[in-house]
Amino acid sequence: MIKLYLVRHGETMDNAAQIMQGQTPGRLNDVGIQQAEEVARKMASAHIDVFVSSDLYRSMQTCAIIARPHLEAEMHLKGTADASAFLTEDDILQRIETTSLIRERDWGDFTGKFIPSLPKDPKDWPDNVETLERMKSRAQNFLTWLKVAYPDKTILAVGHGIINKAIQSVYYKRQMNQIEKMANAEVRVLIL
């Protein structure tokens, strides 16, 4: 049995400005950093074997903030004095497994555009927007990869709003529009 803590990255500058980020790296704003720090505090005593993140920077940044207390505690147990002084973000990122399977949806020509100005009807979307079927395929591949790579482990994975909906859609065998949107830095638990 795998316990998966599925997390959405913290708020970014583009989230706050309602800009479609898609598969751009992104960077947390001050609110996003505070959100990730709050998750880190709440999850500090939880047992986590593996930290996984989308390979987009906003998720990696969120995951690094959440992982820090765990990695510092691990170093302290190994006898490293004042572990926090030695852990840079790069040190932490080296301990996080990254994957493109949980990248955000590829929004094609919509990437970088102001979200309220975009057409709502998918029939009016450009052909280069990633389909829901393709996203659900990536989501299924992600869940399969976790089962093979990390059986019987507790995993914290940081992804994005829509790919996290796709993961839950596959997991619960429900349509994506039946899955509630995750807030920035929200955590949901799935048992695989």
Predicted regions, residues:
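Short beta-strand scaffold positions
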Residues: 53-54, 137, 158-159
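Phosphate-handling substructures
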Residues: 27, 69-141, 180
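Generic beta-sheet signal
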Residues: 4, 153-161
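Domain-level recognition of soluble alpha/beta enzyme cores
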Residues: 174-192
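Short active-site segment of divalent metal-dependent hydrolases/proteases
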Residues: 12, 163-164
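Glycine-rich phosphate-binding loop signature in dinucleotide/nucleotide-binding domains
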Residues: 45-47, 146-153
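Active-site-proximal alpha-helix that buttresses catalytic centers in soluble enzyme cores
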Residues: 2, 7, 11-87
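Short aromatic-enriched loop/helix-cap "lid" or pocket-rim segments at secondary-structure transitions
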Residues: 16-19, 63, 108-112, 170
